[in-house]
Amino acid sequence: MNGLMNGKRGLIMGVANSHSIAWGIAKSLAAQGAELAFTYQGEALGKRVKPLAAEVNSDFLLPCDVEDIGSVDAVVDAIKERWGKLDFVVHAIGFSDKNELKGLYADTTRDNFSRTMVISCFSFTEIAKRAAELMSEGGTMLTLTYGGSMRVMPNYNVMGVAKAALEASVRYLAADYGSRGIRVNAISAGPIRTLAGAGISDARAMLSWQQKNSPLRRTVTIEDVGSSALYLLSDLSRGVTGEIHYVDSGYNITSMPTLEALRVADAD
């Protein structure tokens, strides 16, 4: 099926490089005809994003710092001026002090807790509120979460709390905007080698563990996530909102490692 996103215009937030999950999503959308705008934070990231945007025939790049609400407003104003409307938004933004992702969650500082929540969670609500004003004919919103929102994951700490709040936000925003034909969903992806993932200690070991213990016995790719995002952002999912869609090779359904892994652990 081709042309699923023909005539659709959307904003992609969170591309850092060619390994970003947001980039995998952007490629899938562009391949189906979507016209894309990209945000970036700072000149260094802007230099990385510009050639990627060009690969999908986009010259619409906008600086954005989600900690500065004026910056968010400027992005929405620029989209309104150029396009007049918006069909979808992809929010792939998260941050926490990596030094506080190690050790005890209880040692999280007040400052890092607040900043993590604003960037990783509340920014989606602020963007959704403004984007909705450009979706007079309906639209879709998508954010990214992780299994650490539901279960304790090593070296994730306050990010797990932020992702749990983000998932709750998805449900409340879906309820807020459903009557206006605006759908809101999230993808919970398994661990992927990304710039953000590099901030998590022992990320390589976590990737290996999922590969060995998920039902599909493999990790996921940005292309896997991109395909699911295409479904959630297109009319194929027109009856779906408020959902957390797992793309993790089925790891979320497991409660124990494989028997092989248990035997190895027992032998140790």
From Swiss-Prot:
<feature type="binding site">
    <location>
        <begin position="20"/>
        <end position="21"/>
    </location>
    <ligand>
        <name>NAD(+)</name>
    </ligand>
</feature>
<feature type="binding site">
    <location>
        <position position="14"/>
    </location>
    <ligand>
        <name>NAD(+)</name>
    </ligand>
</feature>
<keyword id="KW-0472">Membrane</keyword>
<keyword id="KW-0443">Lipid metabolism</keyword>
<dbReference type="Pfam" id="PF13561">
    <property type="entry name" value="adh_short_C2"/>
</dbReference>
<comment type="pathway">
    <text>Lipid metabolism; fatty acid biosynthesis.</text>
</comment>
<keyword id="KW-0997">Cell inner membrane</keyword>
<feature type="binding site">
    <location>
        <position position="41"/>
    </location>
    <ligand>
        <name>NAD(+)</name>
    </ligand>
</feature>
<dbReference type="GO" id="GO:0004318">
    <property type="term" value="F:enoyl-[acyl-carrier-protein] reductase (NADH) activity"/>
</dbReference>
<feature type="active site" description="Proton acceptor">
    <location>
        <position position="146"/>
    </location>
</feature>
<keyword id="KW-0520">NAD</keyword>
<feature type="binding site">
    <location>
        <position position="163"/>
    </location>
    <ligand>
        <name>NAD(+)</name>
    </ligand>
</feature>
<keyword id="KW-0444">Lipid biosynthesis</keyword>
<dbReference type="GO" id="GO:0006633">
    <property type="term" value="P:fatty acid biosynthetic process"/>
</dbReference>
<protein>
    <recommendedName>
        <fullName>Enoyl-[acyl-carrier-protein] reductase [NADH] 2</fullName>
        <ecNumber>1.3.1.9</ecNumber>
    </recommendedName>
</protein>
<dbReference type="InterPro" id="IPR014358">
    <property type="entry name" value="Enoyl-ACP_Rdtase_NADH"/>
</dbReference>
<keyword id="KW-1003">Cell membrane</keyword>
<dbReference type="GO" id="GO:0005886">
    <property type="term" value="C:plasma membrane"/>
</dbReference>
<keyword id="KW-0275">Fatty acid biosynthesis</keyword>
<feature type="binding site">
    <location>
        <begin position="192"/>
        <end position="196"/>
    </location>
    <ligand>
        <name>NAD(+)</name>
    </ligand>
</feature>
<keyword id="KW-0276">Fatty acid metabolism</keyword>
<keyword id="KW-0560">Oxidoreductase</keyword>
<feature type="site" description="Involved in acyl-ACP binding">
    <location>
        <position position="204"/>
    </location>
</feature>
<dbReference type="InterPro" id="IPR002347">
    <property type="entry name" value="SDR_fam"/>
</dbReference>
<comment type="similarity">
    <text>Belongs to the short-chain dehydrogenases/reductases (SDR) family. FabI subfamily.</text>
</comment>
<dbReference type="InterPro" id="IPR036291">
    <property type="entry name" value="NAD(P)-bd_dom_sf"/>
</dbReference>
<feature type="binding site">
    <location>
        <begin position="65"/>
        <end position="66"/>
    </location>
    <ligand>
        <name>NAD(+)</name>
    </ligand>
</feature>
<feature type="binding site">
    <location>
        <position position="93"/>
    </location>
    <ligand>
        <name>NAD(+)</name>
    </ligand>
</feature>
<feature type="active site" description="Proton acceptor">
    <location>
        <position position="156"/>
    </location>
</feature>
